[in-house]
Amino acid sequence: MKETIVAQATAPGRGGIGILRVSGPKAVEVAHTVLGKCPKPRMADYLPFKDSDGNVLDQGIALYFKAPHSFTGEDVLELQGHGGQVVLDLLLKRILQLEGLRLARPGEFSEQAFLNDKLDLAQAEAIADLIDASSEQAARSALKSLQGEFSNKVNQLVDSVIYLRTYVEAAIDFPDEEIDFLADGKIEAHLNDIITQLDHVRSEAKQGSILREGMKVVIAGRPNAGKSSLLNALAGREAAIVTDIAGTTRDVLREHIHIDGMPLHIIDTAGLREATDEVERIGIVRAWSEIEQADRILLMLDSTEADNQDLEKVRSEFLTKLPSNIPVTIVRNKADLSGENEGIVEQNGYTVITLSAKTQQGIALLREHLKQSMGYQTNMEGGFLARRRHLEALEQAATHLQQGHVQLTQFYAGELLAEELRRVQNHLSEITGQFTSDDLLGNIFSSFCIGK
């Protein structure tokens, strides 16, 4: 018989309420042993919780959920008593004395919910993300993932891929049926539609990943542009040494901050110039390494220097050398010395913010800009949360879609296109964990009258 698991569902320590959760075939037996009866399904019952000698350990609310109508899909019993840890430990010890009961592993209740098709993998992960959410936006987005918004988008993509595979494999396996879908433009049009759909989901998932894991912001620029002063201003403390000596920062400095609950990883780097010694050279190499891994780059300019007044000169010196796929915000620092007013404008496709890191003038504008860059929305109607593994799976799927497009349009290779689509489907299924090869087989026989 399958084991029954039990664990404390509330955080350890003192509290108003403490909850033990039991899941498995012996949940009813636990109820009769500890409560003297099993409550009616989905009905709260106020009862004493007793030890093996019949002595009352505590009294509280008991809830019973009969399979499959429970979180795990199994029989579930919840005992909600007072939040004293000693009482909860005694009650847990009593339950574990029963044969066939064991302590649950971390996350095992959610695992059972997944195995019993109550949740897919993305939804199960969203439970942890909801618990760990550091902002209202993150919590709402995690809830949307838990409710299946991300999974639904992935499943729609999978359905589209299966539909296309159905046609392609029919053309390969049943040529006598005069199904020659590779000969017209319908397959390519449908493939292009899937590529477009996937690009939209990838964009949303990347935003959701930043919201969950934090945006990596790298401060870059010439020496003595005020990069370390900006790090200190954003961090709200003296995290970096600031002097008038160019090249003070030799190594990478990191600060983890929150703006209205939105997590940011701020990276201060060595000034970009021709190195004067080996230590500075190593620091500059590390700076470029951080730049290449950034989610956003803050390019610091000294607004008192004449060369920085011309954006074209800045473009030739810095912007053309920065990774083209990473968004760049130009920060004109030292407004207190140049006499410029704080402000934010769009110029030649770049956001340009004028501020003074020393006096904090304009820092609020930068904070708001970074917050909006992470997807912060005042109406809290943002999308779903996503993890790095989701992004990797979507990236792999996109790669194989593009390879499939090449096989179709350049080589007219139906077998290779079908193989690329199979790989796309497998990578997408890694997100939800719901794919089986029987899905495709059933689709072929139900969609076509082969042999008619």
Curated annotation (Swiss-Prot):
Its EC number is 3.6.-.-. This is tRNA modification GTPase MnmE. GO terms for molecular function: GTP binding; GTPase activity; metal ion binding. Exhibits a very high intrinsic GTPase hydrolysis rate. Involved in the addition of a carboxymethylaminomethyl (cmnm) group at the wobble position (U34) of certain tRNAs, forming tRNA-cmnm(5)s(2)U34. It is found in: Cytoplasm. (6S)-5-formyl-5,6,7,8-tetrahydrofolate binds at residues 21, 78, 118, 452. SUPFAM superfamilies: P-loop containing nucleoside triphosphate hydrolases, TrmE connector domain. Mg(2+) binds at residues 228, 249. It comes from the Bacteria. K(+) binds at residues 224, 243, 245, 248. GO terms for cellular component: cytosol. Its main location: cytoplasm. One of its GO terms (biological process) is tRNA wobble uridine modification. Belongs to the TRAFAC class TrmE-Era-EngA-EngB-Septin-like GTPase superfamily. TrmE GTPase family. It comes from Pasteurella multocida (strain Pm70). Keywords: Cytoplasm, GTP-binding, Hydrolase, Magnesium, Metal-binding, Nucleotide-binding, Potassium, tRNA processing.
